[in-house]
Every structure is written in C-alpha cells, then in structure tokens.
A protein has these predicted regions:
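Catalytic core of pol beta-like nucleotidyltransferases
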Residues: 1-16, 20, 32-38, 49-205
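N-terminal loops that bind phosphate or other acidic moieties
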Residues: 43
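Short acidic/polar active-site loop segments enriched in Thr and Asp
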Residues: 23
Length: 205
C-alpha cells in the first residue's frame, strides 16, 4: 500500500470534518521508518484542538470509510492532553513521527536530557519485565522472542541516541551502528536472559 496516496485521501477528509481544528497529522511506525511490509498497519498521529465523545465518533466514522480501514491505528489526542503528557513518552512520539500536516513543536511538553534518560529506563524496564514474565509463565517462551526483540529494537534506538546523540529510526540503519552484544539481541539465537541482562545494564546507567 502507498501510504502517501492513502494520506492524500485521509487528510482532506479530516480537515473537512474538523475545520480549523486540526493541529497536527503525522505517520509513525513501519511506514514512518520506511520499513513497511504488505500487511503493515497505517500508524497515525492526529492532534485536534479538543477530543471528546463527538470527535471520537466522527473520527471513527471517517476511518471506517477509508481503504484498509482494518489496518489503521495510532495516537489521537487533543492539545491539552499532549501538553500534559509525560515528557519521556512524548519524546518517543516526537522522534518516531514523520510530520504530514502541521508541527509538533509548541504542542509537546518541555523535554530535555532527563526525558531521554527516563525514556531509556522505561523501555529497558518494560523489556526486562516482559522477558522475565515470558520465561516464567509462557507455555512456549521461544515463540514470544520475536515480539520481545521488537521491543528490544525500540529500546536500543533510545539507548543508541543517548550514547551518541544521533537518533536512527530504521532497523537496517541502526544494526551496523550497534555494539556486537547489542546487535545479537536482534538476531537469531537471542535468549531471554540476554535481553534481561542488557535491560538491567541500561536501567543502571
């Protein structure tokens, strides 16, 4: 699917549904990274001036009329909610979103180095817990590894950004920049204890 052609149909319809009320529209996820496959979701970011029951109903109806409606998902919010969003989480939104209409500047909460530190620790701690939970409670832990490695990829992006000051969104571009031990977390042969060990190390930095 050509996400730009999809967006060329969606954006005018959204602007018509909410005249002078759309603050920002962007794309994130695999399409934003340039890594989409034939079954990838259309991962939207939409910021309105207000988002309540009426707006949710209108957005749902609009999305239902779009091609590939069953593959749309994303982050919808209003200005006030985004301004109050935890900075470490908003940082990830900023880094991972490709703008299509408007700008996130002026909409996001203040964020600095501490937000990045918190984002890395949050991603690492979530990975640690998920790997530990899988090892203890999943009937077939090895089947959960691909999903855990995807979570590790997101955490590794932030850790690399903290280490180098350069944010690299795409997996194919990030892999050669990682340390060998980090790269192994995304390759065949990765283990749950290895994911936990790396996550614990990043939380302690």
């Amino acid at each position: 699917m050509d996400w730009k052609a999809w967006m060329d149909a969606f954006l005018p319809a959204l602007l018509e549904a909410f005249p002078r009320r759309v603050a920002f529209v962007g794309i994130q996820g695999s399409y934003g990274r340039g890594e989409a496959g034939p079954d990838s979701d259309v991962d939207l970011v939409v910021v309105l001036d207000e988002l309540g029951e009426a707006e949710l109903t209108a957005c749902r109806a609009l999305l239902a009329q779009m091609p590939f409606a069953d593959r749309t998902c994303g982050f919808f919010c209003d200005r006030a909610a985004l301004a109050a969003w935890p900075a470490f989480d908003a940082l990830q939104l900023k880094l991972d979103t490709l703008p299509v209409y408007g700008s996130l500047e002026g909409l996001l909460p203040p964020m600095g180095q501490e937000a990045l530190e918190q984002a890395v620790r949050a991603g690492a701690s979530a990975l640690y817990h998920a790997a530990c939970h899988t090892a203890l409670f999943d009937a077939c832990p090895e089947e959960a590894l691909p999903a855990l490695q995807k979570a590790a990829f997101f955490a590794l992006r932030l850790a690399h950004y903290r280490r180098t000051g350069r944010y690299v969104a795409a997996r194919r571009e990030l892999l050669p920049l990682l340390e060998p031990g980090e790269r192994a977390l995304l390759e065949d042969g990765c283990t749950l204890p290895a994911l936990m060990a790396w996550a614990k190390q990043e939380m302690a930095r």
